[in-house]
Curated annotation (Swiss-Prot):
Pfam families: ECH_1. The gene is echdc3. InterPro entries: ClpP/crotonase-like_dom_sf, Enoyl-CoA_hydra/iso, Enoyl-CoA_hydra_C, Mitochondrial_ECH-domain. This is Enoyl-CoA hydratase domain-containing protein 3, mitochondrial. PANTHER family: ENOYL-COA HYDRATASE DOMAIN-CONTAINING PROTEIN 3, MITOCHONDRIAL, PTHR43602. Residues 1-61 form a transit peptide. Keywords: Fatty acid metabolism, Lipid metabolism, Mitochondrion, Transit peptide. It comes from Xenopus laevis. One of its GO terms (biological process) is fatty acid metabolic process. It is found in: Mitochondrion. One of its GO terms (molecular function) is hydro-lyase activity. Its main location: mitochondrion.
């Protein structure tokens, strides 16, 4: 059971397809396979772009504790690899993620297990901002509760026009307090509170209007547009992007004066980098930069 039922969404279709795993291996997922033999997440990597697929559509890609741990493991896998430039998080089926598995939140699991669920999830969400590479959510379908939190926590989010977003915990007696942390930092306060108080879903276009997602595209263009953005990032300097991302989140937590002080210092630091000087020289010389990622 997951948050999705409070939104009336139908069960996602069965698993299907073949996925290329890191290092060129492949695994066929048969629709008749038992769940215990099916990976909760699937990791692919090519040309510096890592795609992590939430792979449990029968359970609406619920963020159970094992799912959270699997996602975290895939994100941290060789995270310092200089060839890794972008991470994309997508999902199999017509639900991006329905949030926490409500069966794990019943009394028989106990308080300690509940704390482990929420603490592990919080570490995952904060991990996105500490990674040196951008993280993109590719959303197709419904994202509710912790699933909506996941979208809000990513650096960039591209959604299909069929996507919807909600924090419906209030309707089952469990306020979406942890999703509210990410949601409240992604959209205006009054929009966040209306979503949290009512549990009503918003459309992809409203999510774009309020800043929860970066872009909305037709469903058939979702993957190509997400890949286009990822490839564009791959054309930049790894070290410059890493510095810029870290600085952006650091300055957001500071006062206006302190933020400008920090970023002024970082701009000077950036100029001292090899790629900082290479970029300026290439612009003046009207040629493409040759990045050394240093």
């Amino acid at each position: 059971m997951s948050w999705l039922r409070s939104c009336g969404e139908r069960t996602a279709p069965a698993l299907r397809g073949t996925y290329r795993i890191l290092a060129g291996q492949s695994r066929f997922v048969n629709s008749s396979s038992h769940l215990q033999h099916t990976p909760l997440t699937v990791l692919q990597q090519e040309h510096g772009i890592r795609r992590i697929i939430l792979n449990n559509p029968q359970q609406r890609n619920a963020l159970s504790l094992p799912m959270i741990q699997s996602l975290q493991k895939d994100i941290l896998h060789e995270a310092d690899d200089p060839n890794l430039r972008v991470i994309i998080i997508s999902a199999e089926g017509n639900v991006f993620s329905s949030g926490h598995n409500l069966k794990e939140l019943t009394a028989e699991y106990g308080k300690d297990y509940h704390m482990e669920v929420f603490n592990t999830c919080a570490k995952l969400m904060t991990l996105f901002q500490t990674l040196p590479v951008p993280v993109i959510a590719e959303v197709n379908g419904l994202a509710t509760a912790a699933g909506c939190q996941l979208v809000a926590s990513c650096d960039i989010a591209v959604a299909s026009d069929k996507s919807r977003f909600a924090t419906p915990g209030v309707n089952v007696g469990l306020f979406c307090s942890t999703p509210g942390v990410a949601l409240g930092r992604a959209v205006p306060r009054k929009v966040a509170l209306e979503m949290l108080f009512t549990g009503e879903p918003i459309s992809a276009h409203d999510a774009l209007l309020h800043g929860l997602v970066s872009k909305v595209v037709p469903e058939e263009n979702l993957k190509s547009e997400t890949n286009r953005i990822a490839l564009k990032i791959c054309q930049t300097s790894h070290s410059v992007v890493a510095l810029g991302k870290s600085t952006f989140y650091r300055q957001m937590a500071k006062s206006l004066t302190d933020a400008y002080k920090l970023t002024s210092e970082v701009m000077v630091e950036n100029l001292a980098m090899k790629d900082g000087q290479e970029g300026l020289k290439s612009f003046i010389q009207k040629r493409k930069p040759v990045w050394t990622h240093s």
